[in-house]
Amino acid sequence: MPAKPQVDGHTLVDAFCCANIFTETGALKPRSDKVWMDISNQLKGAISAKTLNFYARINRNNMITVVKERCGIQQLDTSANLTLNSTFPDDDPEFQITEASKNGPLPILYFNLELDLELWRSIAPKKDQKTEKLQPNWTDTMAKLIYKKVPLPCAFNFRKAKLSDKVDNIWLRIEGYCNDCSSILKGHCLVKPDEQCGIMISVSVPDTRGIPHNKKRRCTGSRRLEIGNELILKKAALWRKEATDNMNDDDPEPSYIPNLPTLRKLREEATNRHLGITKDRDPVSSLYLKKYEGELAGCILDIGLDEFFCIYCTGTQVKTYASRIKTIRKISIDATGSVVLPIQKPNGDSSYVFLYQIVMEGDDSIFPVFQMLSAKHDTASIQFWLSRFISKSGHFPLEVVSDFSLALLNGISLSFNECRIATYIKKCFHSLLMEERTDLPPCYIRLDIAHLIKMICRKNVFKSKLPNLKDFYTRCIGLATTCETKDSFAELIKSVLIVALSQSSGEDEKGDILSSYRNEKYLLARIATFTAPDHKETIEDNCIPEDQEEIDEDVTDFISNIKIAAEEEALNCNSVNCRPNPYFLPELMPPLIKLCKYFVLWTNVMKEKFCSKYDVGSSALVEAYFKDLKNTDMSIFHRPVRADKFVVQHIRCIEAVCKLERAAMKRKTVKTPSFIKENAPKKMCSKETKGFLEEILEESEVEYLLQEENWKVKNKTIKPTEGNDAEDNDTDDENKEMDLSEQPKEKPRGKYLKKCPNVELLYNRPHRRKQDEILHNGGSMGPVWIGKQLLQFKNTCPFDSLVEILSTAYIDNFYYKSLLDDFYTDNLTIELVKKYAVEGVSSSLYCDRGLVLKSFFDEKHQIIKCDANIGSFIEKALNGVPSASSHRTHIKNNHDCRNQKYIHHRLEVIDVEKVGHLDVQEVVIPFIDEFFARTDGECKICGGQQILERQPGPHVILDIEFAMDAFHQIHHNGLPGTTTLLQVPEEILIQEKKYILSGAIEYVPAMGGEIGHYIAYCRRVIGSWEVHNDMCRQWKKFSALNTKMTLHILIYTRKN
């Protein structure tokens, strides 16, 4: 007797009727919808939500039919009007659509799918099968064909195809179901096709175009493997773009195209299959198993767990290295990160894993010698790795190049020289003191020059400094790398220290040339003619810090003597009346002295002792190898990758490189047999061609002596020889574009290691800030935070114009810069000028500008209007940095006179009141001479005699507004005063002090009673002019010097 159901049919129908289980189109809601869980809770969990949805989908006991009748929902019978013909009527070449009113809310599409013979054979039943059934990939083929015929968004799940004509004379039946919209697809074929013919399948499906769908077809079986194999060498996003061939405009996305996460998963699976990686194992266990089985057996030498390391090398590597080391005794060693994922520890911690690599120059490419992955980066780990390299290869290198990592240097020295790097430096220095080569280590250790230059460039001493200083001292270090004797190195470093420590330069009061100026000229002359040997500057930030090594006392004393001698000479160069030294940088001495203690590693002083043929210590080989490894060999991965995947792929690439390298070595050593030379066909040529070839050969006999092989540039295009005929030149012009595309691009040598003939002109040219952007007017910007207040500043053009000219003068005029740096450090505007000149525009600069402007106004509102006459603005901004200082002195000191309180009177702006002259030059120069002249007069307070003297400041700011307006009101019927920049004197002499014109500020009157605008014109050191308008984004060149303008302010800065 069957068991009694927990819920009878009537109760279940009532529950379905009360709940909204249908969508707007009349289809059942998906299983993930909340309504099924609500019905299950209403039935007290007697039937699960999943089972309820299943009952509804299969219409168990016609329950859904009864529910639709009660709810008044028209039933969608997708099988209605299904004919039993071999095909549907084909009046329309595409498909036929029934009326929606006849069959429910959605119309039914009828169309035929034609499968050619090749496509049908790919899914047809196989002959050797016991039961007739389609091949597993038939569902994917049908999905593509249906979308190509009608772009439906449905992701149909197909049931098992029925192949039999015994029931209703239909040989093939297929049926699919869409989980999103509950549509049912049906197809049939009445007659079994012949073996040499294709098949036509009649399909009926609801027209669901325009209904949003979210589901995708599952990617399984052979299609999953096929897509995964395609994705190994292709990005997932690119694969999706290429899979849209069947799509037209406004078509929905095909359901058979997987989304990006699925494609990435398929790529990972295919990569694991390709590498033989099992995902359920951790990387260390996977490497341990591969050490003893598979293609990596014998390649992995040592594995460590805590801290993780893995040393690996192939047998072919060892054989090739043994052959190469006989002719090339130099290797490069370096480390890089960002290739392997960190190994997680049980407590959740992890450490970075570095790849340590030894490479050497090969005949065909860069040859990798030995490698290690390690999460520990100390001397002991590196020494153990190199000791395994020695025991495995059995050959010592004579020269090793590395970067400035003390852990790496100590490991190299302990392995190849059996002493620490400090002892190695001591032995090398003692050999320099002796003429004979005694007690010299067997291996020559050198530092990579590119790492050295980059390390110098990143020193903090160059921060907030003008770029000239960094360029000059970095070129000096480049000079020191070429020193081949101890004495020449000491002379050069002494000159550098003298220049860096001396505050003054030029000539003293007696007319004698200072030592700082003499050494400055000596270094500039060396820079103008110096050229370092060729090297590549592709470097990475992989220096591993370690404690400072204790250097031998003899080396320390040698460097200290250089330092003491330089300090003594620099002390004599600190004269007050001389010009400031533009290269004064005392902060450079400590890092430079520390670097000089390792001078035997980065100069050429030991080159002759070790009989090295290389002029430069360069690790460009290993850096280029790292670049190729990351961008080419590991391009199938998204770096960083698991350690086991990396090792497998790396060993495969190493084996490929070794095969090519051994083939190149064999090709180089094997001689061409004599019978091939004897039987070689002789080329025939005319007399003219023969004579032309003889001329080329004669030239090449001399030219080949000047050529050298570059291991990184292969098949370099040869430039055409001069003197070719017109036809050859035309051919070269036609192929010029092709040759340029085939020629690989060489990375140029670093600028600090090239000669610079115009170095003095280079250092005197006008410099730019870090960005070309200028200060923007506060009215065109948003508010800024000043402390806890959000303030908006309007019409900041007066202040911006002043800051633009002063910052430009700070960059171009070194004497003016030194005055501001040494004597005026309390003024907020001057500090803003310095920050703007060195760092450029930034958000913090606008906050500082707001802080300065806020101090000028007492307004408590959030919007501060800064419109004011620029003369009064300058008096507030440059308080304490005057254009002139007045000194009143009584001939007979009268202590009772009240005028003594004003003995020091400062002026920020000088008003030019002289009128009646023809141009600005005739207004300014006489006024300056008269203003700064000494005057005798009577004191207005006590009646005694007094002397008035005025001294100019670091700058002289002239307000010529009233003078020009008065002049034009007299001579030009009251029009505003206008002039040109050509009429403004470029230099003025005040009390034997030279002042140069640095800029002018123009006032542009507004129309309609609005506020006018100020624009700054900056004059650069070479005489060119620039317009700095804070309503524009960038500065612009200004060449129309004859343009009439209303100048209000002239700014002169002190030159000497």
From Swiss-Prot:
Give the span(s) annotated as Disordered. 716-749
Q: Give start-end positions of Basic and acidic residues composition bias.
A: 737-749
Look up keyword Hydrolase and say if it applies: no
- Report biased composition (Acidic residues) as residue ranges: 724-736
Compartments it resides in: Nucleus
Major subcellular site: nucleus
Q: What does this protein do?
A: May be involved in the transposition of NOF-FB and other FB elements.
Name recorded for this polypeptide: 120.7 kDa protein in NOF-FB transposable element
Q: Which organism is it from?
A: Drosophila melanogaster
Q: Which gene encodes it?
A: NOF
